[in-house]
């Protein structure tokens, strides 16, 4: 997988969103961007928590 873990999934969903946006599937692109955004937020929160512990 691309980078593994949450970052890899976020990158995957971001790329899917770009592809679907180019193809004109706005609903799928928006959903993919939403998933990618939440994965990045979760990754950042977990990274901060792991740095503090």
From Swiss-Prot:
<dbReference type="GO" id="GO:0005886">
    <property type="term" value="C:plasma membrane"/>
</dbReference>
<keyword id="KW-1003">Cell membrane</keyword>
<keyword id="KW-1133">Transmembrane helix</keyword>
<feature type="transmembrane region" description="Helical">
    <location>
        <begin position="33"/>
        <end position="53"/>
    </location>
</feature>
<keyword id="KW-0812">Transmembrane</keyword>
<protein>
    <recommendedName>
        <fullName>UPF0391 membrane protein Memar_0049</fullName>
    </recommendedName>
</protein>
<feature type="transmembrane region" description="Helical">
    <location>
        <begin position="5"/>
        <end position="25"/>
    </location>
</feature>
<keyword id="KW-0472">Membrane</keyword>
<dbReference type="Pfam" id="PF07043">
    <property type="entry name" value="DUF1328"/>
</dbReference>
<dbReference type="InterPro" id="IPR009760">
    <property type="entry name" value="DUF1328"/>
</dbReference>
<comment type="similarity">
    <text>Belongs to the UPF0391 family.</text>
</comment>
């Amino acid at each position: 997988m691309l980078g593994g873990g949450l970052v890899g999934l976020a990158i995957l969903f971001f790329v899917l969103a770009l592809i679907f946006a180019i193809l004109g599937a706005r609903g799928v692109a928006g959903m993919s961007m939403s998933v990618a955004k939440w994965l990045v937020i979760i990754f950042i929160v977990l990274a901060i928590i792991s740095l503090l512990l």
